[in-house]
Amino acid sequence: SPIIVDDKVYVSFDNGRLAVFELDSGFLIWDGAISYVSGTSELENLIDSDSNPLVEGGLVYTTNYQGKLNIFDTTQRRSIWSYDISSFYSPVLIRGMLIVVESNSSLKSFSMQTLEESWSSQDYLNRNLSNAVGYKGNLIFGDLDGYIHIIDPLNGITVGRKKITKHPIKSIFSRSNNLYVVDESFNLFSINL
């Protein structure tokens, strides 16, 4: 989905590119590659970006499948940092950390001060994780068994979990101090932690 910030529309595309448009006119302001195709087969060349760009503090954070975590500077209109990683979801900025749920359901965290890897976790490997959100200072995501997991973003340690549904959790989002979970059967749950 497009993200609107300061009269600009930020969109990531199936071809692995980020584009920024003027909201009023639709005029393309700038674009850049999140990652480049590097394989020899169609499957290896799949670099789809289904995640929403995250726009914060003059920077745009993007991810794509079989690609990169990439940070673009909106003033310079170019990538200023990237890291090889595969993800279906938008990265999360929380408590000075940049966190990515990888496509294999492992987690990777980077310090926002140094952009060096802070911690990684394979505790949820191949559990078909949902997107992650920051909520009340914690990182929260769902899994294929209908659980939500609560993680301390500073060290990656699981501090809680709760069974929400018997179906896999597909999406988590927060609005107005509430946490919402959508499962594979399109059931919506409102959670207060």
Where are the predicted features?
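Extracytoplasmic beta-rich repeat domains
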Residues: 1-6, 27-57, 79-95, 104, ...
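Structural signature of WD-repeat beta-propellers
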Residues: 6, 13-14, 57, 64-65, ...
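Structural recognition of beta-strand segments within beta-rich domains
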Residues: 11, 62-66, 70-72
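Surface loops at the rim/top face of extracytoplasmic beta-rich domains
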Residues: 12-14, 18-24, 31-33
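Short loop/turn segments that connect beta-strands within beta-propeller blades
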Residues: 22-26, 73-76, 111-115, 152-156, ...
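C-terminal closing repeat unit and adjoining cap/tail of repeat-based domains
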Residues: 114, 138, 143-187, 193
